[in-house]
Amino acid sequence: MIIELPRTLRFIARHFAGTRKFFAEKYMSDAVTACRFEHITYPFELAVMDGKRLIALAAGAIEAEEIELAKKYLTADDVVVEFGSGLGIAAARVHMAIHPKAHFCFEANPVAVAYSEHLFSMNEMQIDVDQRALGDGSTSPFYAADDYILSSFDVPKNTKHFKKIDIPTISLAAVVKEKKPTAIFCDIEGAEDAFLPPEDLQGVEKVIIELHPSHYGVHGVQRIKERFTKNGFVSVEQQQDTHCFLRR
């Protein structure tokens, strides 16, 4: 069975997170295999989500700000590269909305990569997924937690149930040279400060990026914005911590 919420319930579940537990209890059963939102079917897999998260997907609540900006500024003429694509939720919705010329995702977490590949295949989307992280080209330790959300390049603090694995990284300059993107979509949990230098964005016209003041403070956010400005970009819109930069 595939869950598809009525419009009113979608609105409630999207804007009032506390209601998702109630909806999960109402809709979830052993027969549920997926949910559907905006013509995209999301498989229900316990390895990466519970009932509440599936309801959030069915309501369009996950990564809503990033997706809204991408839909507004990206077009079918773009070659899109996404760093930190996670479960592929934003990638799928953006891909469905704009049908870009080409679409490449980079994600470190092997569990997330497996889910996103299943998601893209189920919805017949031509999106390439690369299990590498944005970095300096070296290999980096990654802590894969039993709870997908707690996985990190840092040792998880809220669980003891994880395993350490090695993940290859790739530099921004190498990605730009190989994929020739016109648009970058990025959410890498603070690593953007070190590994997404605007000076390496030759040929890139649009950057939608989530900044993380909890990692480097408000002064760090301002420093990153100034680096974009110095390298020919202008900030055109912000939704919460997600910023859109366009080349002048």
What does each of the following model-derived ranges do?
Residues 1-248:
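Phosphate/nucleotide-binding beta-alpha loop and adjacent structural elements of enzyme active sites
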